[in-house]
Amino acid sequence: LDWCRDNGVKVHGHVLVWHSQTPEAFFHEGYATHKPLCSRETMLARMESYIQQVLTWTNENYPGLIVSWDVVNEAVADGSDQLRESNWTKTVGQDFVNRAFEYARKYAADGVKLYYNDYNTPLDPKLHGICVLLDSLIADGTIDGYGFQAHYSVGSPTIDRVDWAFQQIAKRDLLLRVSELDVGIDDTSEENLQKQAKYYGNLMKIFLRYADRIEAVQVWGTVDDLSWRADEYPLLFDKDAQPKPAFDTLVELAQ
């Protein structure tokens, strides 16, 4: 954050509430895992306190630097239109996402945008579940945008399916972010590199159609060998930091 402040780089915050990155002890009485899970009231108080502390501290120490936040990450279950079972649903219940956004809106500085972020957006029935959740947050007046994680592979999901998902989210008049973009391939043969470039290009054509709504397209890494999917060569630069055909394709489309 110091570097961003000193170099005039605005920041998107990730993430306030995420089931998989919240310590188990946070959900238990006395913060001790051998004790029972907390009551709804206790967990709501802990959630509010945590969100308040993070947002207040960042705003006081880095005023105006963090311009948006992912409030909740990956709450909808794969292969379902329901929230995934987690310690948040076990303690707070099915409205934990709504409560997180309520608290984030309460403590965020004026003008800070609040996002829900998830993956596998193009896949039904998950897309339906995401839309239902977004509609409830829109009704609450607490959400500004949706973050599309886009951890794809060439041909999967199809471009048409990605386009359809964008249509469903965009018609809800939310801001959009492509929050985690990478595209896997089996190997770095010239044929596969060209397929990767074409798929990246087709994705970017979709993104450009919503350019008035998309705040950012964030590639999930820089060079292939440092990617979390290193064995799938998913990024725009190879292990030697040389641009791949996908990079050239995106540059051409951006001009």
Residues of each region from the PLM?
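Substrate-binding cleft and catalytic face of glycoside hydrolase catalytic domains
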Residues: 1-115, 119-121, 174, 183-185
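Non-catalytic positions within long, well-ordered alpha-helices that form the structural scaffold/packing
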Residues: 5, 59, 138-139, 208
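His-enriched metal-coordination microenvironments in redox/metal-binding proteins
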Residues: 10-16, 143, 150-151, 155, ...
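Short, acidic/polar
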Residues: 47-57, 124-137, 197-206
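Aromatic-rich peripheral "rim/lid" segments of glycoside hydrolase catalytic domains that contact
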Residues: 57-60, 64-65, 70-94, 99, ...
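Distinct, well-ordered alpha-helical segments
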Residues: 81-82, 123-139, 158-166
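Short, conserved beta-strand edge motifs with alternating hydrophobic and charged residues
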Residues: 115-117, 145-149, 177-180
